[in-house]
Every structure is written in C-alpha cells, then in structure tokens.
C-alpha cells in the first residue's frame, strides 16, 4: 500500500512539473484546431462583420476564413510567448492584402473560450497590454468558441 501511495505521489509531482514547465509547444498545442468568433469589438465599436469568422491553427500556421467558410481571408504563421504577461501572440501574414504584416497581440483561455486582442489591421499601433479595444486604440478584441 505504501508503495502505491509513493507511486501516486510521484505521478502527481511529475504531472505538476510537466505542467509548470509547459512552454511554447504546450501553448501552441492548446491553440490547435478551429475557433469561431462569437463577439468582436474594434476601436471602441462592435465589429459584427468579424463574428462568425473561423480561426484555425494547424502546427505553426493560422488561417482565418469567412463566415460561410468559402473564402480564406488571412493566412500565415503564428508564434506565442507564454512568459509575457499577458501571454502574447504574433500573427505573421504570408499571403493576401496583409502579406508581410505582423499583427501583435495578446491572448487568454477560459475553458473552450479563446480571447485575443491585437493591433490588426493597423500594425503601426502598439501591442495591446489589456483585453480592451477602446476608441482610438486601433485594437480589435475578439472572443472565440472552440469549434466542434
């Protein structure tokens, strides 16, 4: 019995150490899959045209599709920094009208909800430091639900 308790304690400790040491790969793994925009605000105003768009992460790539899924709106690579507070994400556009531009943002998870705030489309604006898109900020705040 004491051996079982020792093994269980060891497993719990090992799990905690793995989670505590979770770095960029773990953050990237959590993002993987598709997310549907459920709410959006840009520069202090509702951004209803964004609601319904689907953001998909595959490996180190991202893709944003139109509401009906027929059009790729943006695509490129992304990188995260879990050590930044709040955690940061950069979307590097590799095709389309924003090719060569990098949107700098922040992100957070709450269960199957992903919240991002970034400086798209005005890349001259600074990376957001809070989850808000106040008038004049040039920031866009989007809430996503994990797609089934």
PLM region descriptions:
Residues 7-20:
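Bacterial N-terminal signal peptides
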């Amino acid at each position: 019995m004491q051996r079982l308790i020792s093994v269980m304690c060891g497993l719990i400790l090992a799990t905690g150490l793995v989670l505590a040491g979770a770095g960029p790969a773990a953050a990237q793994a959590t993002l993987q899959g598709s997310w549907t925009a459920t709410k959006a605000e840009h520069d202090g105003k509702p951004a209803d045209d964004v609601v319904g768009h689907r953001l998909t992460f595959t490996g180190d790539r991202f893709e944003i599709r139109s509401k009906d899924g027929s059009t790729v709106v943006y695509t490129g690579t992304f990188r995260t920094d879990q050590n930044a507070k709040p955690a940061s994400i950069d979307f590097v556009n590799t095709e389309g009208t924003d090719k060569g531009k990098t949107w700098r943002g922040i992100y957070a998870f709450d269960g199957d909800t992903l919240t991002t705030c970034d400086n798209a489309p005005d890349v001259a604006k600074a990376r957001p430091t809070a989850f808000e898109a106040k008038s004049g900020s040039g920031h866009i705040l989007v809430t996503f639900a994990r797609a089934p």
